[in-house]
Regions:
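Short, well-structured N-terminal submotif of metal-dependent ribonuclease cores
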Residues: 1-43
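Alpha-helix capping/helix-boundary segments
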Residues: 15-16, 47, 120-121
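Residues that scaffold the ATP/ADP-binding catalytic core of kinase and kinase-like folds
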Residues: 19-20, 54, 63, 124-125
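Residues at secondary-structure transition points
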Residues: 25, 42, 69, 94-101
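Glycine-rich, phosphate-binding/catalytic loops in enzymes
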Residues: 26-29, 59, 131-133
């Protein structure tokens, strides 16, 4: 019997920073899941562009320098693990933060679990959940409400 296909997952920028810049222990299980192919992380070019942009924020530049980590190393991890998708069509939900909209739209387009620590995204979790989408701030997933 074939192994089940890894479940699709959309990961926001906050989580990526916790994974690869801050090495937050709460992100360790996700890092393992990505490395072992337990999830299929879906992303698009706009998400990579946002990560590149925020890595250049002064506070994050200092954090990278303190860890001896270049932006290119973080972006290489993105490129290694992300399954790039075309830019998604608009979903039924509108996020207060336009930078976060693409994460919602991609999750909707692929019926993927959306992993986010962003308040504007999490504020939409209940409505998205009623449409069958799992939105959570935690990994392993616990639905946000």
């Amino acid at each position: 019997m074939a192994a089940p296909a890894p479940r699709p997952l959309v990961i926001d920028t906050h989580w990526l920073l916790d994974l690869w810049l801050f090495h937050d222990p709460r992100a360790q299980a996700l890092d393992t899941a990505l490395a072992e192919g337990q999830v299929r992380w879906l992303a698009c070019a706009a998400m990579r562009d946002e990560l590149a942009r925020v890595l250049d924020y002064p506070a994050l530049q200092r954090a990278r320098e303190a860890r001896g980590l270049g932006a290119d190393a973080v972006l290489a991890r993105f490129d290694q693990h992300a399954c790039l998708q075309p830019h998604p069509p608009a979903s039924p939900w509108r996020c207060r933060d336009p930078d976060d909209q693409v994460f919602i739209d991609l999750a909707w387009a692929h019926q993927a679990h959306l992993l986010s620590r962003d308040r504007a995204v999490l504020a939409l979790a209940a409505g998205m959940g009623r449409s069958g989408l799992l939105v959570s701030a935690d990994w392993p997933a616990r639905p946000s409400s």
